[in-house]
Amino acid sequence: MPFAQVSDGTRIHYEVTGRRSGAPVVLIQGLGATKSGWNLQRIAMATRYNTIALDNRGAGRSDAPTKPFTLEQMADDVIAVMDEVGIESAHIVGASMGGVITQIVGVKYPERVRSLTLVCTACRNHPWREDLLKSWASTAQDEGMLALGKNAAQWVMSPRSFRRLLPAIGWLGPLSVFRSKSPFVAQVNAILQTDETLTDQLATITAPTLVIVGNQDVLTPRGDSEELADIIPNAELIVISGAAHGLMIEHASTFNREVFGFIDRVESRRSLAVSQ
């Protein structure tokens, strides 16, 4: 079971799958999710890319630090995993909170990035979303993780999927979020600490960037992605019709087609530049 140990001693679990000779792709999940949230992508990537999926600190098999941490530290965790695997640069794909981590990687470590894919994410904390995250943290602390899973599901899935999967949410909740409430609350606090500095730095990103969102996303609505695409130089914006916050699961085939096509285009341009 591979781990990368970072400077503060935290061990970050990761898995490498796919074609070792393929372009490296790093997958970063969001709040309450482990690397298993990328399973539909990892399966489809198996014959194309060298895929590195990690569990964020506090989630899955990674360590859960007892001290507070920041999203910048979580971006450093991504680089530590890349160092451990021996990857000099990669296509970084991040969803939701993982998308914010991906933005930080793009700003802080431009030389390690081949491209950025920002999935259902944002670059600022709107007051209504801060209040929602605080309410989730309170639910986790006061009512437990099962109650949190039921509450959060309606923000992640489209109304149709929510109705279809409602009978299963009782067991989906604890499986899709953290082992205990403390790491979850720590990640919420890390998100809430992120300030406008990141937004101001996005214009310095030089890597090719894809911003992708569902038109039914109510947690990180289309406007958040439009803002990202406006600020980041030459960013591409794709809006998937009928998709909500969990678009990589609910609309996996469409999502995969768009993301893989973007990565392949970037790789083609890289190969052409090297040959000239």
Give the positions of each predicted feature:
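Short beta-strand/loop motif that positions the catalytic acidic residue
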Residues: 205, 211-213
